[in-house]
Amino acid sequence: MARVKRGNVARKRRNKILRLARGFRGSNGTLFRTANQRVMKALCNAYRDRRRRKRDFRRLWIARINAAARMNGVSYSRLIGGLKKADVRINRKMLAQMAVVDPASFANVVNATQG
């Protein structure tokens, strides 16, 4: 069998990792072994946080809606229950945006749920 020299393949593999590690601090961006560990950790964190971001934004929206609802004299749970009962289909993202940008229309939505 012919001898396989891995110069190009190995260099490409290492350079791919080092490209991903560009901007990392200290040896984490220059030495292959530490860069490889940091890149694997970074990719794990990115995967986890793409899922966590959805939860975090939902929590933020709920906190904003709750604050605005309480300013209008109703709790978050009563507001959401009233919206479901009144068959008002506005999602939490839109409600939170409305509460921040246009409090008057948010107050109208709150009044619609209490009627």
From Swiss-Prot:
Q: What is one process in the GO biological process aspect for this record? A: ribosomal large subunit assembly
Q: What does this protein do?
A: Binds directly to 23S ribosomal RNA and is necessary for the in vitro assembly process of the 50S ribosomal subunit. It is not involved in the protein synthesizing functions of that subunit.
Q: Which SUPFAM superfamilies match?
A: Ribosomal protein L20 (SSF74731)
Instruction: Give the highest taxon in the source lineage.
Output: Bacteria
Q: Name one GO cellular component term.
A: ribosome
Identify its protein family: Belongs to the bacterial ribosomal protein bL20 family.
Keyword Repeat carried by entry:
no
PANTHER family per the record?
39S RIBOSOMAL PROTEIN L20
Name of the protein:
Large ribosomal subunit protein bL20
Source organism: Synechococcus sp. (strain CC9311)
HAMAP family referenced in this protein's UniProt entry, alphabetically: Ribosomal_bL20
Q: Where are the transmembrane segments?
A: none
What molecular functions are annotated in GO for this chain?
rRNA binding; structural constituent of ribosome
Arranged from A to Z, the UniProt key words for this protein are: Ribonucleoprotein, Ribosomal protein, RNA-binding, rRNA-binding
